[in-house]
A protein has these predicted regions:
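Rhodanese-like catalytic fold shared by cysteine-dependent sulfurtransferases
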Residues: 1-27, 34-78, 87-128
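Short, surface-exposed ligand- or partner-binding patches at beta-edge/loop junctions that are enriched
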Residues: 82
Length: 128
């Protein structure tokens, strides 16, 4: 008798234009710094910087550097990551797979491609 094995964790590269047409993801994570995120970001994207994600490799730091909402995410639901030019988001995607997420979308070209495609962005107004 052959038992079905769980699906192999996958990272899928997807252009911004295709991503906005795809089914919803449980979370859309912008891995840039807080400053970069505040300047402009995709709608519904939540900021969780790459350094914080990478620090989660250290078991003792894991629960200190990642927010509570992160630990409540279902590991089998799609998750997406974006950065400025798609140099940081692939590293974040790999780490998310190591943390047990099975479906991770990496937005190719990052926020630069997002803007070039004419997709909407938001800006956070930070009080000085």
């Amino acid at each position: 008798m052959v038992s079905a094995s769980p699906p192999k964790p996958a990272i899928s590269d997807v252009p911004p234009e295709d991503f906005v047409q795809s089914p919803k993801v449980s979370k859309f994570i912008d891995v840039r710094s807080r400053l970069e995120y505040n300047l402009f970001h995709a709608p519904n994207a939540i900021n969780l910087s790459l350094p914080r994600i990478l620090m989660a490799q250290v078991p003792l730091l894991r629960y200190l550097v990642l927010p509570r909402w992160f630990w409540q995410l279902p590991k089998d639901e799609p998750l997406a990551v974006i950065c400025l030019t798609a140099h940081r988001s692939p590293m974040a995607a790999q780490m998310l797979v190591k943390l047990g997420f099975s479906q991770v979308f990496n937005i190719t070209g990052g926020m630069m491609a997002w803007q070039k495609a004419g997709l909407p962005t938001h800006r956070d107004h930070v009080k000085e």
